């Protein structure tokens, strides 16, 4: 990736014992389809976990259960030691603590870029308007779209819109950021500008769960790669270990199909 320093991929491969997100024996069905099967996953504060796997493996569903966009049938999920609330104001607070960046940006089309980034601060965090605007402008500068603040989303490129979506999530001061295939809807030339922002967040210590097909990002930014197939976690390893010496046949098969060089 241009402009991004690539490490050996290990970083702090052994994160601290301070678990921020814990999924324990989580199961989820869509009708007869068992999309998450006995999932156990612990994510430490400051850890970057990249979830990869073939289509239909349950990656996005796993990501969406962490802020209860998808409910689970059994098992438990805790954030910072507390179980996920089911509904109401507590759920709104949880979602403020868990930033979510979607494939499709999900910006409000009728609000300016600045208003999009201010909205959650005003409505959920009850931040003073002047302070919310100051923070929003600083975050837009940070992700490289400060000059676009007064435009509407439709006036921006896909890459710019996704960077606004990242700024909007950061504006809430989240404890963890979830990225559900954040670059898969982008034109190829826009992918790097989003990955560079994500790489910067990772280097600054943001706790991140990233569902992606971008193997370069997984190699350079992840502390841990989680490989899923058929609703199960098949393998977990540091990027170096996973890409150079995958243990499972399923992972070997997956990598042989996507790594063309």
How would you name each of these model-derived features?
Residues 16-239:
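ABC family nucleotide-binding domain
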Residues 1-27, 261:
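ABC-family P-loop ATPase nucleotide-binding domain
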């Amino acid at each position: 990736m241009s402009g991004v320093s690539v490490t050996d991929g290990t970083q702090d491969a052994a994160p601290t014992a301070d678990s921020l997100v814990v999924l324990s024996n989580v199961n989820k069905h869509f009708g007869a389809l068992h999309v998450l099967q006995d999932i156990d996953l612990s994510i430490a504060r400051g850890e970057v976990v990249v979830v990869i796997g073939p289509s239909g493996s349950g990656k996005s569903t796993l990501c969406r259960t962490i802020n209860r966009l998808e409910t689970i049938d059994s098992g438990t999920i805790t954030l910072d030691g507390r179980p996920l609330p089911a509904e109401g104001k507590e759920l709104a607070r949880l979602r403020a603590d868990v930033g979510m960046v979607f494939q499709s940006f999900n910006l409000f089309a009728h609000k300016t870029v600045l208003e999009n980034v201010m909205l959650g601060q005003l409505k959920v965090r009850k931040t003073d308007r002047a302070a919310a605007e100051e923070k929003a402008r600083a975050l837009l500068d940070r992700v490289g779209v400060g000059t676009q603040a007064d435009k509407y989303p439709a006036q921006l490129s896909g890459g710019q819109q996704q960077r606004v979506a990242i700024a909007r999530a950061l504006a809430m001061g989240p404890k963890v950021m979830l990225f559900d295939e954040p670059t898969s809807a982008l034109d190829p030339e826009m992918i790097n500008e989003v990955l560079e922002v994500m790489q910067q967040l990772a280097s600054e210590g943001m706790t991140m769960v990233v569902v992606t097909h971008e193997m370069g990002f997984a190699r350079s930014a992840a502390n841990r790669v989680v490989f899923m197939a058929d609703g199960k976690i098949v393998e977990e390893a540091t990027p170096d270990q996973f890409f150079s010496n995958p243990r499972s046949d399923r992972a070997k098969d997956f990598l042989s199909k996507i790594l063309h060089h």
